[in-house]
Regions:
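A short alpha-helical cap/connector motif
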Residues: 1-132, 139-160, 164-215
Length: 215
């Protein structure tokens, strides 16, 4: 049985992994100061993991569903090889005045295409086969986003889904009005039984599911 990581252990981990760098440090701080639910940003540990996964998978094209403040997009773009591109969609247009300057001011701005819009509708129109997809948008539509992603990711490609433990709420029976938790539960149950993929859940922060499309 896994125990929760203590604050001291978290501090130890952060002292023994790569630095997030000054730019991402300032972005994370600004996110928590200026945006509601700032803790939704990936942060140091998850950001370094995402970058490492990009190094391992070596994708040419990445799709991100849910940009928020841009922290995860920048982290993943840092791991892209020359010629690689990350397409990130944010459905909440109120975030654009905060997020766009941070993305465009980063050293990897030339590798990121930031769009305000619904990725479920817009991403398939790109006509691109993706090597990796990161789902981190509206939990109520996770299953729809997953089906969209599965249709445009290559065989052998990867789909990552954030927040799949949802602060432990998935362990309890969700109220009918709690559509966010219900969305995560339906997603988790569906993916667990989907013969088209292999999957594993990491108990990192709020839960990170790594899915590989068979073929």
């Amino acid at each position: 049985m896994m125990n929760e990581i203590t604050e001291r252990e978290t501090d130890y981990i952060l002292q023994h992994i790569d630095s997030e760098g000054d730019y991402l440090y300032r972005l994370y701080r600004a996110t928590n100061i200026h945006l509601l639910r700032g803790r939704m940003a990936s942060g140091h540990l998850q950001g370094r993991l995402l970058k490492m996964l990009v190094h391992m998978i070596r994708p040419k094209n990445i799709l991100e569903v849910g940009t928020f403040s841009g922290y995860s997009a920048i982290s993943m773009a840092e791991g892209l090889e020359d010629g690689g591109c990350l397409f990130t969609y944010e459905i909440n247009d109120e975030l654009e005045p905060f997020t766009r300057p941070w993305i465009e001011g980063s050293e990897v701005a030339d590798k990121i295409v930031f769009t305000i819009g619904d990725a479920i509708v817009e991403a398939p129109k790109l006509g691109i086969t993706f090597d990796m997809v990161f789902l981190d948008g509206d939990k109520r539509t996770y299953l729809e986003a997953y089906e969209m992603a599965l249709g445009i990711v290559r065989p052998g490609g990867f789909i990552l889904a954030d927040n799949t433990l949802w602060d432990g709420h998935v362990l309890e029976e969700a109220r009918p009005a709690d559509r966010q938790t219900l969305g995560i539960e339906h997603f988790n149950d569906f993916v667990a039984n989907d013969p088209r993929v292999e999957r594993v859940i990491l108990p990192l922060r709020d839960g990170l599911t790594i899915i590989r499309k068979k073929g």
